[in-house]
């Protein structure tokens, strides 16, 4: 996988907040093993009965607090009687800030540098993890 492909995958992830194929995550890890993230990931949801009522594509976060902040932001307009559910799973993924800093240190074109800097600016507020989601999780709250 060449660098342009990796950068394009990261833009796709940022713009669409979509899940990236496991094979893409594996290939990036092979090329940049220093960027690997092992650890717990959290997702917070509002649930009424058995029905999840917050955005189904809400992303996983590296801390329970940041996951709940995102969920709290979605609470307006949620039905009365909903309860908060926090899921935790152990994940392998890519620390995107580490990855982008590693790429930035490489001998890359000016166009690639601009794209990497744009991605870094968009990820600067919290630790952003590109993870393989395997849906083996436990309910922690």
Language-model features: locations:
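Conserved NAD+-utilizing ADP-ribose enzyme module
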Residues: 1-41, 48-141
């Amino acid at each position: 996988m060449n660098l342009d492909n990796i950068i394009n995958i990261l833009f796709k992830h940022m713009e669409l907040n979509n899940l990236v194929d496991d094979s893409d995550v594996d290939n990036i890890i092979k090329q940049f093993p220093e960027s690997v993230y092992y650890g717990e990931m959290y997702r917070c949801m509002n649930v009424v009965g058995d029905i999840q009522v917050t955005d189904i594509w809400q992303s996983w976060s590296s801390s329970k607090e940041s996951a709940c902040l995102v969920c709290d932001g979605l609470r307006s307009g949620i039905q009365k009687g909903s309860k908060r559910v926090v899921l935790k799973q152990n994940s392998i993924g890519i620390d995107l800030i580490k990855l982008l800093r590693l790429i930035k240190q490489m001998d890359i074109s000016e166009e690639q540098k601009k794209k990497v800097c744009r991605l870094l600016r968009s990820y600067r507020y919290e630790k952003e993890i590109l993870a393989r989601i395997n849906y083996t999780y436990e309910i922690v709250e």
